[in-house]
A protein has these predicted regions:
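Acidic/histidine-enriched, beta-strand-rich ligand/metal-binding domains
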Residues: 1-71
């Protein structure tokens, strides 16, 4: 997991073999939200976005199968 500069998102991680994006939000720091089927291009756009929270809400949240786990 990599810390990011965002008021919404605490950290993100990505497994290119399974195309799974993992996101930890500041509001739920003990929960990892896992998004399946996220392409490398989408992750690159996400990590390079000026507003990661806005990108997350418009391009990721609610658009991919999601599971969550407690850390």
């Amino acid at each position: 997991m990599q810390q990011v500069k965002s008021s919404l998102i605490k950290s993100i991680g990505y497994n290119p073999l399974t195309e799974q994006l993992s996101v930890v939000l500041h509001t739920s720091p003990s929960t990892v939200f896992n998004y399946d089927g996220v392409s490398r291009a989408t992750v690159n756009n996400f990590t390079n976005a000026t507003s990661k929270g806005q990108f997350f809400n418009s391009k990721i949240r609610g658009r991919f199968p999601t599971s969550k786990s407690v850390i």
